[in-house]
Amino acid sequence: MAFNFNWSPLIADTSRARDMLTTALNKSPKPPIIVDDIIVTELNLGTTPPELEILEIGDLAEDRFRGIFKMSYAGDAFLTLKTKVQANPLKTYLSNKPDFASPQPLAAAAGLTIPLQITLSNIRLSGFVILVFSKQKGLTLVFRNDPLESLKVSSTFDSIPFVRDYLQKEIEGQLRVLFMEDLPAIIHRLSLRMLSPEYQEIETEERLEGANDTTAAIDPLASPPEDAVDAFGNPLDEAQISAMSLDSGEIHASFSQKNILRLAALSESQRTLSLFTPGIREAVFRAWAGHPDRAESGAATPALTQGSLSRIQSTFGSLKSGASSVASGSTGNETLSSRPTLASSYSTSAGISLGSGRSRAGGMRKRKKRVVDLRRKDGADSGVSTEANTPLPSTQVSDTSSVIPEEREAEEELATPPTSPPQPGRRFESRRGSLDVGTPKRIPEEPPTFGPLLAPAPLIPNASKAAKSKRTVSPPAHLEDPFVSHTSSRRPPISRNKLRQAQQSTSPLLRSLSFDKVSSLSALCSPPRISSPPNADLMSSSGGILEQAWMQKMAQEIARKVQEEKDKSSGQRRPSHSRTKTAPTGGFWQGEDEVEAPPAYVA
């Protein structure tokens, strides 16, 4: 079924259609760039009518019709609009960018309004239309989908690319709303005007009422203010106010000067970083002195005062200083004096909150004292430091000795640390130094209390170890202590703690001695009745648990034999005592040359 459109009468009268389009375009919310009404200045439907394809006929009669059509239009119709826009290219560009990628600056303090003319042409439409016609109710046309395919937008800003693209996108969006919502209402009113005489009469009456409306706009500055003042701030009476001319500028200058100054300050604050800037959305103020931030406001959330900020800085500074001191193994005084932390420098330079500085320093001193006390107590009670075996050139130094070196000798004289059975992988600390079980250890650098035994420089490493073993294995009655008087002839018997200490000191040092050195050392301290295992050469060459057990057994046998000799007769003890005392005077190495050959060993 074909339709013949009589297109010429529709082209002839388009004034009413222009008015309806203007009303429809201004009804919907406009973008912020458009600052004036949109006026349709020209509407030309062109010479090519649209094409309709019948899909369904629902109702067909003489006075009514209902059907579904497929419409397509590719004619030469065009539409010209005029409006005013705010010409701020940077603001227009930023409105197209995402918020997270734009700093939102302003290009100008005030907007610049420029007239804009837009022409819409090359309109392409395609969609499904529901058409209902009735002589009493007029023509109703509804689009089931968005019919706008494309159009061309020509404007005054075609030379600016991003403004042209922005206008193209915005106008396409407005036209899609126009076709879906406003165009059916416009067509329906036009059909009623042409078909229904009653609607024509109602419309004529509305036009007459609009023309007779002579309501003038009210000027807020036309009436005199209540607290009128002159240019110098003096109040005016009613007679002076009535004498003024309403058209002159005197009536406008009679407003309160206080309010005018406040309005001027408010206007100027929008262009500066003044503290009087009111609350603006998406704005960050450099200073804020609002009511909730004051101390006397009683707000639920406590404000960050200067003292609280300094306490926060002190907390972070103390944590940093504590971590650095633990990592370096230095004392608390060295950390505070040599490397001041962030909190101490901040408090010293700015002079903020002395109370917070004292609490910070007290906390740091308490932390340092606790670390030192733990290490001192650990070394004095157990004498065991659980760490891995270190090689011979060890560089680790005890923290206790570095903190309090002057109190080391006093603690040696007073405290006797208990010992435990030697275990592989353990490190033992005694009064004379520290040693690692299972690995050779160097002689401690600090001088012992009875130092004349090692006064001459040793020539052979084994000789120094023999001197060390001789000093530790011999009973306490034969030792010389420079701090003890020599008037006493009798000595107390050897204690169990000293015996175990001698065993620990003897075991790693005798391991590197040859068998003849061990035999000569045994001949100095005991009669030739000491029993030794027949395979001593094999055991001396091989290390491990068997060698340590044999060394302990030999030391116990030596101590037992010495105790028996002491109990037998005092006459045999005095020559041995004088023999031992001649060693420091004549030198240890001279006495070693007089050592006889080792006696025979009995199994």
Swiss-Prot record:
Keywords: Lipid transport, Lipid-binding, Membrane, Mitochondrion, Mitochondrion outer membrane, Transmembrane, Transmembrane beta strand, Transport. CDD domains: SMP_Mdm34. Residues 371-380, 558-570 have a biased composition (Basic and acidic residues). Component of the ER-mitochondria encounter structure (ERMES) or MDM complex, composed of mmm1, mdm10, mdm12 and mdm34. Residues 1-205 form the SMP-LTD domain. Lacks alpha-helical transmembrane segments, suggesting that it resides in the membrane via beta-sheet conformations similar to those predicted for other outer membrane proteins and porin. The SMP-LTD domain is a barrel-like domain that can bind various types of glycerophospholipids in its interior and mediate their transfer between two adjacent bilayers. One of its GO terms (molecular function) is lipid binding. Its main location: mitochondrion. The keyword Mitochondrion applies. Component of the ERMES/MDM complex, which serves as a molecular tether to connect the endoplasmic reticulum (ER) and mitochondria. Components of this complex are involved in the control of mitochondrial shape and protein biogenesis, and function in nonvesicular lipid trafficking between the ER and mitochondria. Mdm34 is required for the interaction of the ER-resident membrane protein mmm1 and the outer mitochondrial membrane-resident beta-barrel protein mdm10. The gene is mdm34. GO terms for biological process: mitochondrial genome maintenance; mitochondrion-endoplasmic reticulum membrane tethering; phospholipid transport. Residues 320-332, 452-463 have a biased composition (Low complexity). It comes from Pyrenophora tritici-repentis (strain Pt-1C-BFP). Disulfide bonds: none annotated. This is Mitochondrial distribution and morphology protein 34. HAMAP family: Mdm34.
